């Protein structure tokens, strides 16, 4: 597996070791996993059969896949496992944003620990959602996404971006921001996004109140 380049130098230095740990945690069918260099280019070497292709395609560091045959590398076509383009996650740029590859890695490892059977779709909650990087990453992978964010400006930025993004992509969607009321008075806001069969819901509020907000 050819490792994807990272714009973050600190993250790039740790990428090979993180890629090893991620594949071990998410792909039980892979073995002999180790980082290697070919002509000065970092790769991740492993042994697996075709049943692992979907998992490999979702790896945060996967740029391309090759099969080692008689000392040569033969390209292997990866399945299209993402529901939306990667620019859903990469377009927003702001100070303090978590590295996109690292966010995907954390989501993959988290989902890899879930033992409950499911139809492929999960419900992902980020109780400190910021501007929605984790939520967008979950949507890309075909999961419903839920978030809570204390900062009103971050909430507004996430809502504005999603509305603009899906409108410009000409994708049928709804994105509604409504007030949240208690005892007849507004105490926050709620964003409900529906797109391509998926749901994203985000509240303004305290992470400690997540259970009540979604209850």
Q: What name fits each language-model region?
A:
Residues 1-27, 40-41, 46-51, 59, ...:
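Class I S-adenosyl-L-methionine-dependent methyltransferase catalytic core
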């Amino acid at each position: 597996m050819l490792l994807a380049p990272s714009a973050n130098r600190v993250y790039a230095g740790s990428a090979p070791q993180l890629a090893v740990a991620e594949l071990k945690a998410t792909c039980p069918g892979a073995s002999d996993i180790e980082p290697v260099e070919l002509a000065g280019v970092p790769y991740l070497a492993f042994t697996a059969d075709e049943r692992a292709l979907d998992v490999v395609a979702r790896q945060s560091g996967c740029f391309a896949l090759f099969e080692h045959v008689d000392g040569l590398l033969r390209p292997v076509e990866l399945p299209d496992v993402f529901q939306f383009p990667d620019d859903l996650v990469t377009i927003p740029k702001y100070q303090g944003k978590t590295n996109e590859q690292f966010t995907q890695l954390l989501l993959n490892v988290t989902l890899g620990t879930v033992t409950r059977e499911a139809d492929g779709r999960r419900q992902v909650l980020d109780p400190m959602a910021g501007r929605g990087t984790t939520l967008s990453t979950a949507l890309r992978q075909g999961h419903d996404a839920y978030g809570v964010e204390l900062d009103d400006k971050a909430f507004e930025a996430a809502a504005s971006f999603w509305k603009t993004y899906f409108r410009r992509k000409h994708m049928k969607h709804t994105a509604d921001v409504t007030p949240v009321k208690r005892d007849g008075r507004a105490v926050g806001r709620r964003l409900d996004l529906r797109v391509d069969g998926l749901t994203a819901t985000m509240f303004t509020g305290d992470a400690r109140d997540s259970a009540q907000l979604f209850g």
